[in-house]
Amino acid sequence: VSRVALLDIFLMFFILLATYFLLDNQYWLSAIAIGAATGVKWSGAYLIPVFLLISINFVRTGLVKQLAIRITQFIITPILVYLSTWLGWIFSSNGWDRNWAAGQSNSVIPDLMRNLWHYHSEILNFHTGLDDKHSYSANPWSWLILGRPTSFYYQSSQSCKPTSCAQEILAISTPLLWWAATISLAVTIGLWIKKRDQISSLILTGVVVTYLPWFFFQNRTMFYFYAVTISPFLILSLVYVISRALQSGIKREFIYLFIFLIFVNFIYFLPVFIGVEIPYSAWLNRMWLPSWI
């Protein structure tokens, strides 16, 4: 649980913040948010090339000057903000491998830069080479269908006599909401192909940045909870599709019913969201797919 609490929710926040500022044409603030996101997890850096391209108006005069400004905003600024998150390590004397360069051969490159580069290379080697088998590993292909949610905690007991009890914290989204959002993503892609409006473009950009890069690391051990950064854009996709459905004349009562069903589904799964002890049979009834166990 600590990994999600300490990292992923803040990564998601800064990605959303960067997206909001980009949409509002506040590029400096968007770049700062990207740097902060990258400081939480390197996957935040995926925003840099995408947002850089989005921010450039290629049909506008003064392209060279515009490029210089955008490069400063979306490349240099995120790097500086990212480096600022390392200040605690930089100004320490006993951080991990802080004095690594002292034991190496002499170089014209300052020891501080060599130490920092070494630390980053070690991080990169660890994460790209992380292929240990794990019972809850989940390939990105399965994330959109809730193929293998991560169990953070499970405990069984005999307190519910004559039957046993189960207590679990399962990192899973509200199934009805998640599956509806996945379907809406496919619909959004279709609508974008038909009419490339700003909203659908922004939603799909968010999905591309937060989801597709994971497919380049097929041999790496990955988990479903990495999808937490995708979830805001999936929800936006669902809201977008609902909005388009209302514009096309669908009755609001159907939407209200759908929202109500999602709420009921959320309440039903709440015990496994927060680790409430329930009868084993009740827990088993909530394991809709065998891969959830």
Identify what each model region corresponds to:
Residues 2, 28, 32-56, 79, ...:
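Transmembrane helices and adjacent periplasmic/lumenal helix-loop junctions
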Residues 3-10:
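Short acidic/glycine- and proline-prone juxtamembrane loop motifs at membrane-interface regions
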Residues 10-34, 50, 234-237:
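Specific aromatic-rich, kink-prone transmembrane helix
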Residues 59, 67-74, 78-82, 87-101, ...:
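Transmembrane helical bundles and short interhelical boundary loops of multi-pass, membrane-embedded
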Residues 59-72, 185-205:
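Membrane-interface helix-loop-helix junctions at transmembrane boundaries of multi-pass membrane enzymes
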Residues 79-142, 146, 279-287:
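Aromatic-rich transmembrane-lumenal/periplasmic boundary elements in polytopic membrane proteins
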Residues 156-159, 164-197:
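Hydrophobic, aromatic-rich transmembrane alpha-helices
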Residues 207-222:
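Transmembrane-helix signature of polytopic, lipid-linked glycan biosynthesis machinery
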